[in-house]
């Protein structure tokens, strides 16, 4: 019975000894991956209400944000000299792209984001927004799961004249 499985510890033991060695590669806590060269945490591939599935290909769904803007906090935007509608260069260790800026208090200082689903070529030959995969690296990934660190890509943000 479940009661018998609780044993002397007084609860069900969820420790799987076969996984303990594998879990040792995980970090003990949050890791600040920012550097002086790349001081921002870029969330590359943020889900927004108009990027679900493939609806972002329909311009009607993204009238307010046709190119998947770079979201940045008011404090950071002021420090860099950016305002909503300006262009900013996003640079990471593996790539660089230019995005339209949206200044919003929904972002914490030190954090910026771009949505998923952009950077694709349109039928008319134009490209809308930034492709998050062009700013991320397969070599920079979680040691346990092997997935790229899309939610904290060290980045630099600069105003484009």
Model-identified regions with their sequence ranges:
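Long, contiguous, secondary-structure-rich segments that constitute the structural scaffold
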Residues: 1, 5-6, 58-71, 75-161
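Long, low-complexity segments enriched in small/aliphatic residues
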Residues: 1-60
